[in-house]
């Protein structure tokens, strides 16, 4: 197959940051993707509907001329979040989901939830009104090995929560383990998972073999090869419970290339080329549209995009920049460590 036309994709987990970084990265998303769920872990975080309104306005202001893109806003769940504010934001159409960060789990998550019981009034309201909860599914207790955080989270946090509130709609974001995939598959309802581009491509060797490679470090951290293969199988299966959420997370290089570097991989610019490679490799190009364009909207109760994009297979590798320059500083682009031959063609 030399070309494939699919509905315009969406990104169901995206970090755009703010200020100069937002202005520097947004075009890489809005050029290809029609919508994205925007992560709320700014400094300070997006905790109220008023915060989300202001942030959405900054995103729209930063859009390049001629780009059509809808930011789908989320709220950062805290132990003090107002159920009434959440419901008002959801009913207004502004708020698409609420994000649960266990305190300390990832970038700018120190204000996250430490005692889930204190957030139960919000979660109960969300269950009642049908508003999804997006979870960063890792525990942060120091005695748990970093490679086991997701599996332990499922057993000790997520499964008890879902048994207590079975009507709560939960998205397990950036699933990284076979445990997570199996847990979603076993669920009868109200559970789905997003999968990143990079977790389909790298395992933990990418970070550690031949030297420490900070631009492959992310949270949740990449796992063993058997987990990567489980993610691939889920992504290419066509199962409607799995969809694309890139977790594209820009950090300027000085914050990555240091003694205590930030977690995050920047994939917005080359995600669709990477995905086409993965799905072609798996003999599943016919399932790419479901993963990138159909399953996510169905889960979030939205219509798929009417616009189409075409990916064309080039004889020579498609060249992406090694770095992008932003007003905040340089950001290294994800290198999949293989040549990319699929290119998103300019729209007529």
Curated annotation (Swiss-Prot):
Residues that, per the record, bind Zn(2+) 1: 13, 15, 99, 247
Q: Provide the E.C. number(s) assigned to this enzyme.
A: 3.5.2.3
Locate the residues binding Zn(2+) 2: 99, 136, 174
Any single Gene Ontology cellular-component annotation: cytosol
How is the cofactor bound, as the UniProt entry phrases it?
Binds 2 Zn(2+) ions per subunit.
Q: Which domain of life is it from?
A: Bacteria
GO MF terms listed in the record are: dihydroorotase activity; zinc ion binding
- On this chain, the residues bearing N6-carboxylysine are 99
The record ties this protein, via SUPFAM superfamilies, to: Metallo-dependent hydrolases
Q: Can the keyword Metal-binding be found in this entry's annotation?
A: yes
Taken from the UniProt record, the cysteine pairs bridged by disulfide bonds within this chain are none
Question: Which Gene Ontology biological process is one annotated for this entry?
Answer: 'de novo' UMP biosynthetic process
Q: Which Pfam families match?
A: Amidohydro_1
Q: In which pathway does it act?
A: Pyrimidine metabolism; UMP biosynthesis via de novo pathway; (S)-dihydroorotate from bicarbonate: step 3/3
Key words, A-Z: Hydrolase, Metal-binding, Pyrimidine biosynthesis, Zinc
- Binding-site list for substrate: 15-17, 41, 136, 219, 251, 263
Name the coenzymes or cofactors required.
Zn(2+)
Primary role: Catalyzes the reversible cyclization of carbamoyl aspartate to dihydroorotate.
Q: Which family does it belong to?
A: Belongs to the metallo-dependent hydrolases superfamily. DHOase family. Class II DHOase subfamily.
How does this chain assemble? Homodimer.
Q: From the Swiss-Prot or TrEMBL record, give the protein name.
A: Dihydroorotase
């Amino acid at each position: 197959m030399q070309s494939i036309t699919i509905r315009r994709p969406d990104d169901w987990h995206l970090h755009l940051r703010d200020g100069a970084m937002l202005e520097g990265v947004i075009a890489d998303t809005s050029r290809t993707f029609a919508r994205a769920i925007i992560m709320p872990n700014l400094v300070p975080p997006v905790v109220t509907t008023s915060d989300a309104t202001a942030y959405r306005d900054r995103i729209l202001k930063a859009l390049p001329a001629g780009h059509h893109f809808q930011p789908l806003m989320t709220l950062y769940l805290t132990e003090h979040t107002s159920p009434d504010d959440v419901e008002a934001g959801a009913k207004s159409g502004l708020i698409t989901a609420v994000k649960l960060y266990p305190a300390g789990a990832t970038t700018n998550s120190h204000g996250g939830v430490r005692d889930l019981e204190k957030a139960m009034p919000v979660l109960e309201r969300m269950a009642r009104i049908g508003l999804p909860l997006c979870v960063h599914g890792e525990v942060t207790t120091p005695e748990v090995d970093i490679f086991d955080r997701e599996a332990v989270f499922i057993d000790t946090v997520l499964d008890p929560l879902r048994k207590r509130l079975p009507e709560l709609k939960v998205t397990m974001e950036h699933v990284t383990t076979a445990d997570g995939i199996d847990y979603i598959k076993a669920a009868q309802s109200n559970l789905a998972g997003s999968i990143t581009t990079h977790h389909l491509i790298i395992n933990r060797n990418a970070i550690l073999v031949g030297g420490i490679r900070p631009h492959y470090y992310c949270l949740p951290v990449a796992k063993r090869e058997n987990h990567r293969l489980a993610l691939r199988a889920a992504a290419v299966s066509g199962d409607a419970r799995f969809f694309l959420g890139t977790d594209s997370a820009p950090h300027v290089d000085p914050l990555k290339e240091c003694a205590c570097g930030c977690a995050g991989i920047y994939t917005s610019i080359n995600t669709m080329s990477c995905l086409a490679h993965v799905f072609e490799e798996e003999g599943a190009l016919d399932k790419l549209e479901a993963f990138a364009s159909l399953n996510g909207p169905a889960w979030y109760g939205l219509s798929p995009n009417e616009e189409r994009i075409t990916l064309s297979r080039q004889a020579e590798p498609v060249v992406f920049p090694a770095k992008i320059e932003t007003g905040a500083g340089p950001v290294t682009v994800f290198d999949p460590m293989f040549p990319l031959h699929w290119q998103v063609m300019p729209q007529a």
